[in-house]
Amino acid sequence: MKRNILLITFCLLAVVAFGQNKKLTILHTNDTHSQIYPLSPNLADTMKADRGGFVRRIAMLKEERAKNPDLLLFDSGDFSQGSPYYTMFKGDVEVGLMNQMHYDAVTIGNHEFDFGLENMVRLFKKANFPIVCANYDFKGTELEKLVKPYIILKRNGLKIGVFGLAPKLDGLVVKANYGPIVYNDPVACAQKIVNELKAKKCDLIICISHLGWNIEGVSDEEVIAGTRGIDLVLGGHSHTYLNKLEYVKDLDGKMIGVDQNGKHAIYVGKLVLDMKKKK
């Protein structure tokens, strides 16, 4: 795919020690905000003009999967809200296109609540991808059966635990739109899930986060600094363009990488994880 229509940010990252040398490719989007078509070619910012678009991403993914069928694809939330398509069809277009992209897991952004719980349930039932969120309590809603705290994937002989974190709803979402859903501390929830995934012998633990980078409230930095055992954070919410991975020290002193790709999917993050053989 030509770089003048869709950019892929690329990082090679040595993440964890494993029984033998292995590599794992991850593609990551966040905050696509219903950007169905490419951005206007007339934008003054040439780094954004004529970028992105679902059709281009679908074509790019087809090419990437042809080269590497074992790659993983994740989204960090807020695929909703931002165009007349969302206003008119309430997420059907976005979820339908994401189904064609075959995401391995997606977490929840605050804008997924914009048309209320009933609409979220309707959309999540249509999704052919897992939706993960570990720090919302969905008891008393249909979402309890549709959203998992984590999933475990297997790729290239690796066991990969993936969990989601989402932001505090109060102040971001109208109370009527999230009803009885309870927000729980992301740091405590993250450590609880990591411990479960470690007990299940996961080789790699990935957090898909919609908490945000360098913002008020609990951020990706705070989650990493307050936990141990996370290997990688794929972020969203703050619309931050990270040209390279940012690193935060966890409780064990390990430097943990964080990726985020702005908004509207004009960038798709690509990470190649080099799993080094244990000595």
Task: For the regions a language model picked out, list residue spans one by one.
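Bacterial Sec-dependent N-terminal signal peptides
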Residues: M1-K23
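Acidic, metal/ion-coordinating pockets
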Residues: G19-K279
